[in-house]
């Protein structure tokens, strides 16, 4: 009888302490996530010091760009590759050719995950790769015959952090002013038009620096956790290869009216544009001044848009 009582007491104690232990562990993971965002923020600031501008999210033309600029259609490596030297990853950076398409980079390079780019509440680097896949493309031959050909779509390492591309105020309706075209983003890490210097070195045209953040670097997000539902982890377009400039949602997100912060189990699991986390009730961000904050998921979308827009003239009240 006494043994049964002891077992019952032990069971009660375990039931009492297990939730507390889980909360402590999640708190530690959330802090680690903030530290990783802080590292990304520092690396981006060092990039700014070196280049007098923040890194472009990707190289991407305007809708009405010249033929020469249209050649650069976003398939060069993303901004996460550009900041590698400032994260003590010079050797990894040296494996990349920023002037060449992502699909031509070595497989071992595009598949290399980094712990600094994953949230510990969501996964480890062992679960941070989107596999290659095949897609059927409809083609028409010279004889007028139709058919399909299968092409290989290159996968690669995935991550949990995305640059702040701004809000949707420029539009997202297929117009030339849409946010995803080069130079149109209202955030800090935005798609930029490519250009070549006199020595034919590939660089970017739309350069965002601290002077281009009139709302203040402490009021404007630099990067944050990207939303992805558990069932969409490591799948395109929800959580595709983060180094691939064609996969904008894999490394840059927007926030504001129409694009709220989302949690792990929110019903809008198909949302591919916005920020969100698997931490209970909050999403972690690093701001342009290097500070980190956990923003309440209940933050209204107007305030979120003010946080994401670098020049809307507002001062957001952040919960």
Which stretches of residues belong to each language-model region?
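Surface-exposed loop/linker segments characteristic of extracytoplasmic
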Residues: 12, 27-319
């Amino acid at each position: 009888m006494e043994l049964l009582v002891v077992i019952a007491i032990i069971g009660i104690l375990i039931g009492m302490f297990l939730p507390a232990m889980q909360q402590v562990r999640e708190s530690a993971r959330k802090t680690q996530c903030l530290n990783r965002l802080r590292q990304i923020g520092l690396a981006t600031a060092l990039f700014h010091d070196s280049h007098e501008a923040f890194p472009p999210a990707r190289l991407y033309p305007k809708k009405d760009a010249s033929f020469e600029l249209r050649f650069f259609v976003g398939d060069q490596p993303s901004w996460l590759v550009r900041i590698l030297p400032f994260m003590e990853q010079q050797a990894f950076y040296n494996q990349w050719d920023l002037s060449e398409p992502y699909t031509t980079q070595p497989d071992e390079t595009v598949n290399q995950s980094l712990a600094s780019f994953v949230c510990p509440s969501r996964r480890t680097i062992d679960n941070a790769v989107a596999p290659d896949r095949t897609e059927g493309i409809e083609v028409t031959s010279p004889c007028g015959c139709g058919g399909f050909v299968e092409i290989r779509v290159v996968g690669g390492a995935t991550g949990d952090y995305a640059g702040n591309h701004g809000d949707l105020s420029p539009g997202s309706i297929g117009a030339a002013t849409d946010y995803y075209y080069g130079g149109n983003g209202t955030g800090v890490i935005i798609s930029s038009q490519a250009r070549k210097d006199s020595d034919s070195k590939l660089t970017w045209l739309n350069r965002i620096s601290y002077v281009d953040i009139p709302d203040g670097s402490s009021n404007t997000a630099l990067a944050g956790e990207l939303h992805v539902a558990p069932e969409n982890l490591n799948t395109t377009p929800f959580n595709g290869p983060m180094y691939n400039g064609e996969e904008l949602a894999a490394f840059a997100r927007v926030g504001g009216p129409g694009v709220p912060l989302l949690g792990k189990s929110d019903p809008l699991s198909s949302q591919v544009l916005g920020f969100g986390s698997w931490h209970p009730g909050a999403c972690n961000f690093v701001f342009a001044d290097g500070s980190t904050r956990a923003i309440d998921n209940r933050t209204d979308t107007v305030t979120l848009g003010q946080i994401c827009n670098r020049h809307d003239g507002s001062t957001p009240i952040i919960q």
